[in-house]
Amino acid sequence: VDSAKRENVPVLAYDRLVRNSDVDFYISFDNVKVGELQARYLLDRAPKGNYVLIGGSPTDNNARMFREGQMNVLTPAISRGDVHVVADQWAKDWLPSEALRHTENALTQAQNNVVAIVASNDSTAGGAIQALEEQGLAGKVFVSGQDADLAGCQRVVAGTQSMTVYKPIAPLASRGAEIAVSLARHEPLQPNGKVNNGFKDVPAILLEPIVVDKNNIVQTVIADGFVRLQDVFRNVPPDQWPKVAPKESGTRP
C-alpha cells in the first residue's frame, strides 16, 4: 500500500480490510452484520443458557468484526444473566481441529450443558459439530456458521448445523471491478459506510449478507448455483429431497 501511494496509485481493499494503512476504498460484505445475524439467529432460538464462542483466526481482521457483531447482540442477554459464555476462544487459521479442541474443552467444563455454539464460519462449525457428535449432542445444540460452503450446507439440511451466512460472490466481484475502474479514473464514489482500519476511516461499500437455513436453502444458495441441490442433499434419502423447479436446482446451463 505504501509503495502504491508513493506512486499516487489508488488502493482498493477487496474483501479484506488492510489494517493501519492509507487505503482509498474498501468493499466487502458487512462483516459486523454477519456476526449480528449469527448471534441473533441463535439467541432467538436459545434465549437462555450456556453459550460457546468459537472465533476465527485471531490475526484475521474479518474474524474480529464477526466477533464485534456477535457481541452487539449477545451483550444485553449476558448482562441480564440470560446467557452465560462458558468458553470464548479463537481458532488459529480457522482450523476445524482448533474448533474441535476448544469445543471439547467447553463441553467438559460445562458438563455438556450447552445450548448454542456461535461458530464464526462453516469450517469452525464443522469442528464444533464433531465434538458434539462425540457426546451425542449433534442436532440438539444450535450452531451457527458462515460461507455456505458445501459441507456447511450439507450439515444445515441434515439438522446438525442450524444456519450459515451466504455472501454472494457475483455482486462483490462486479462492484469491486466497478470501484477499481472509478478509482483509476479518479471518479467520485458513493460509499454506504465507513470502517476504521486503525489509521483512518476508510470509505466503504458494505454488501448485505444473507441468512441461510433449511427453510430457504433452495431459494438462496442452490437457486444461485453456488451449490447444487444433488450435492447438498447427497446424504439425505431421495424421497426427502425438496421438489423444486429446474431453475432452482442450481444446475447451470
What are these regions (language model features)?
Residues 1-253:
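A residue-level marker of the well-folded mature domains of exported/periplasmic proteins
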